[in-house]
Swiss-Prot record:
Entries under PROSITE patterns matching the protein: LCN_CSAB
Entry function: Beta toxins bind voltage-independently at site-4 of sodium channels (Nav) and shift the voltage of activation toward more negative potentials thereby affecting sodium channel activation and promoting spontaneous and repetitive firing.
Family: Belongs to the long (4 C-C) scorpion toxin superfamily. Sodium channel inhibitor family. Beta subfamily.
Protein name: Toxin Td4
Main location, first listed in the record: secreted
Keywords: Amidation, Disulfide bond, Ion channel impairing toxin, Neurotoxin, Secreted, Signal, Toxin, Voltage-gated sodium channel impairing toxin
SUPFAM superfamilies per UniProt: Scorpion toxin-like (SSF57095)
Domain remarks: Has the structural arrangement of an alpha-helix connected to antiparallel beta-sheets by disulfide bonds (CS-alpha/beta).
Compartments where found: Secreted
Cited SMART domains: Knot1
Domain of life: Eukaryota
Pfam families the UniProt entry points to: Toxin_3 (PF00537)
LCN-type CS-alpha/beta domain boundaries: 8-70
């Protein structure tokens, strides 16, 4: 019996709709944050935002089409 697990890659977003900033964070910050949401791994992309791999589909990720960062709630 096989099991299909849906997962995705992407930028983590906070409640404000903005990407998780990692500019002034320690090197392990993004990997830890990605792990916290059950992602496989993560890194600080260009020292600006956390990018995660193999996260469950329920995790909110940044999308240009639905970006609401800086636009209020």
């Amino acid at each position: 019996i096989g099991m299909v697990v849906e997962c995705k890659d992407g930028y983590l977003v906070g409640n404000d709709g903005c990407k998780y900033s990692c500019f002034t964070r320690p090197g392990t910050y993004c990997a830890n944050e990605c792990s916290r949401v059950k992602g496989k791994d993560g890194y600080c992309y260009a020292w600006m935002a956390c990018y995660c791999y193999s996260m469950p589909n329920w995790v909110k990720t940044w999308d240009r089409a639905t970006n609401r960062c800086g636009r209020g709630k």
